[in-house]
Design a protein with these regions (language model features):
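General secondary-structure edge motif
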Residues: 11-15, 174, 229
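Hydrophobic pocket-lining residues within nucleotide cofactor-binding pockets
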Residues: 71, 135, 232
């Protein structure tokens, strides 16, 4: 009887080795070893990155299907110390795909099944690196998934169209004119300008049926408490 891998046990292992985008060395090694132990053809360092792909080939011609999971963790600061944490669930995605690999390794009769473990989903660059590496060149169907804590497990959710929009990061530097807080009319406070930008971005009249979101996720400004701020940096 075939022994399938337990996704929970895989997740427990992966959850203890969170790594940031393009730094998933331990994770990639864990994935590659697991695939190799299953007897699955394994490609590593895809496109010169930490990307890994397992390939299960059927004995007859047929479609090429690719299943994809991301591997990277998110950067956090705890007690003043930077660290990586699997706060977006990519460890569970990787665990689930490895569990699928153990179930599918003897089930593919026609065509080919590719199992892609992508680096740097959070940094966006990972997807481009995988495309440049040619992982999609012969693929007929590509599928992926993402856990949703707000979604009931029993219900599930499948969408034939767009479910999540692509992301883009914008960095804005605002330069003003410093002045004493008691005489704000003599300066240009970049905090005020930054707040105005944030409010106006949120006030854009987009079609509510469209999938979109625009958010300021960081705001940095440094000055003495008695002076208006000369420079501010926004990220969104």
């Amino acid at each position: 009887m075939t022994q399938y891998l337990d996704p929970v046990a895989l997740w427990e292992d992966l959850h203890q080795i969170p790594e940031l985008a393009m730094q998933e060395v331990k994770t990639a090694a864990y994935v590659a070893k697991t695939l190799q132990d299953l007897g699955i053809e394994t490609q590593t360092q895809l496109g010169g990155t930490t990307g890994v792909m397992g390939i299960i080939r059927g004995s007859e011609p047929g479609p090429v299907v690719m299943l994809r999971a991301d591997m990277d963790a998110l950067p956090f600061t705890i007690d003043g110390k930077p660290c990586a944490i699997h706060a977006c669930g990519h460890d569970s995605h990787t665990a689930m795909l490895l569990a699928v690999a153990s179930r599918m390794k003897d089930q593919v009769k026609k065509g080919t099944l590719k199992l892609l473990f992508q680096p740097a989903e959070e940094a966006i660059s990972g997807a481009l690196a995988m495309i440049d590496a040619g992982v999609l060149e012969d693929v007929d169907y590509a599928l992926s998934s993402h856990i949703r804590p707000i979604q009931d497990v029993e219900a599930g959710k499948v969408c034939p169209g767009v479910m999540h929009s692509a992301s883009h990061t914008m960095f804005v530097e605002i330069e003003g004119r410093s002045a004493h807080a008691a005489r704000p009319h003599l300066g240009v406070n970049t905090i005020d300008v930054a707040c105005a930008i944030i409010q106006n971005v949120q006030a854009q009249w987009f079609n509510p049926a469209d999938v979109w979101s625009a958010k300021c996720t960081q705001l940095h400004a440094d000055a003495a408490v008695s002076y208006t701020h000369l420079r501010a940096h926004e990220t969104g």
